[in-house]
Amino acid sequence: SIDVTIIEPNEHYYTCYFSNEVISGERKMDSIKFGYDGLKARGINVVQAAAEMIDAEAKTVKAGGKDYPFDRCIVAPGVEMIYDKIEGYSAEVAEKLPHGWKAGKQTEILRDQLAGVKEGGTAVIVAPPNPFRCPPGPYERASQFAGYFKHHNPTAKVIILDSKQKFSKQGLFTQGWEKFYGYGTDDSRIEGQPGPDTAVVRVDADA
C-alpha cells in the first residue's frame, strides 16, 4: 500500500470538458463543478493549500506552513496566461475580454457575453500561436459560437484571427463549417482570417 497526498489550493474545480456547452446554454455551471470528496473517501490525503517550496534534498513540500515528506513528488502546476504578450491585456482586462482558457469564472463571463451579442453583431476569437494547450480549442469554441448564433442570433457571425496558416484538425473543422454554417460563402457564420498579418499585438478594452 502507498500513502498519497494531494496539495491543492482550490476547494473545487471546473472541467474544461463540456464548458463549451455551458457557454452556449446547454449545461449549467454546476454540471462541470467537482470537489475532492471522492478522493478523500478512497483514503487519499487532500491538503487545501498552495505549495510554497519543494526541497528536493530533504524530500519535502512546504504548504500552508507545514512540511510534507515524500518519496516521489509529481508536480502539476497547470497553465497560466502570459498577459504581457499582448499590449493592453492583463488579468483585470480579462474580466472584460475573457480568454476562456480556464473553466470557472471565465466560462461564466464568456457565456454572458455570447448571450449579450447584439443582433447582427460579431464575436472575435483570437487563436494563439503554437505551442499552446488544447490546439483544437479555439476552433471548437468558434463552432459552438456559430451553433449558438444559428439558433439564437442568426445574423451574427464569428471572426477567427489566427496568425497560423494551418491549425489542428483543420480539414474536419472546415468540413463541418461548410456543412452547417456556410463557411466560404457570403453568408458564412464563421470567417477565418489566417496569416501573420492577423497576429494580435494590442487590445483596448475601453474602445
Please tell me what each predicted stretch does:
Residues S31-Y36, V75, G100-G104, H151-P154, ...:
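Short, surface-exposed, polar/charged, turn-prone segments marking secondary-structure boundaries
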Residues I7, H12-R27, K105-D112, K118-A123, ...:
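Conserved N-terminal glycine/acidic-rich loop preference
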Residues D37-A41, A115, E178:
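Alpha-helix boundary recognition
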Residues S1-N45, P129-L172:
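Beta1-alpha1 glycine-rich phosphate/pyrophosphate-binding loop at the start
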Residues R42-M53, A58-V61, Y68, A146-A207:
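A Rossmann-like FAD-binding core segment of flavoenzymes
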Residues V46-E140, Q144-H151:
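FAD-binding core/adjacent interface of flavoenzyme oxidoreductases
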